[in-house]
Regions:
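Catalytic-core regions of core metabolic enzymes
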Residues: 1-176
Length: 176
């Protein structure tokens, strides 16, 4: 139930939209998709209860199966949501090296926590992992987020029942 895209960005949005309209989750390695198309596609996915992973998402693990540019790690009970492919790579390999395992690593694309996108996929993925019985722990990894968007994500994380480990890479001192 996942369509994977790796095509030139100028052709990506219509094809991804078609996949979403056919009730498929989208994993988009495709980059150079406009921010307007990204927001539109992520809103459509949200409305349909689907995940729009990307655009510019090269790393993911779905049901312990690596997708695209991803290391093979042990299956397990940790769910990862990441707006940083290299962050997902690093964290999932550390989890594996320390004896743990990953059930899902949901890449969102690096712009998901920007003001314009508003963490649509990050929030949907957190809720999905909260409701996913095999997931016992949730990890969130992000490139530097927009402050207001980060605050919304943190508020959501504080409201869920599962333990959470979160890192917002490169963020300056919050002073709060």
């Amino acid at each position: 139930n996942v369509a994977l895209f790796s095509i030139p960005g100028e052709y990506g949005a219509p094809e991804m939209e078609r996949a979403l309209k056919n009730d498929l989750h989208v994993f988009s390695f495709t980059d150079n998709v406009s921010i307007e198309d990204e927001v539109r596609l992520k809103k459509l996915a949200h409305e349909k209860g689907l995940l729009m992973m990307g655009p510019d998402c090269g790393t993911g693990i779905i049901s312990s199966i690596p997708i695209a540019f991803t290391n093979v790690v042990s299956p397990g009970n940790i769910g990862v949501v990441g707006a940083s492919g290299t962050g997902i790579q690093e964290v999932t390999t550390i989890i594996d090296r320390l004896g743990g395992g990953v059930v899902h690593a949901i890449g969102t694309g690096g712009r998901d926590l920007s003001d314009k996108v508003g963490a649509i996929t990050v929030k949907d993925a957190i809720v999905a992992l909260e409701n996913h019985e095999p997931t016992d722990v949730i990890t969130v990894i992000s490139k530097p987020p927009a402050k207001e968007v980060r605050d919304e994500v943190v508020e959501l994380l504080q409201s869920i029942s599962k333990p959470v480990v979160a890192i917002f890479l490169g963020e300056k001192d919050r002073k709060s």
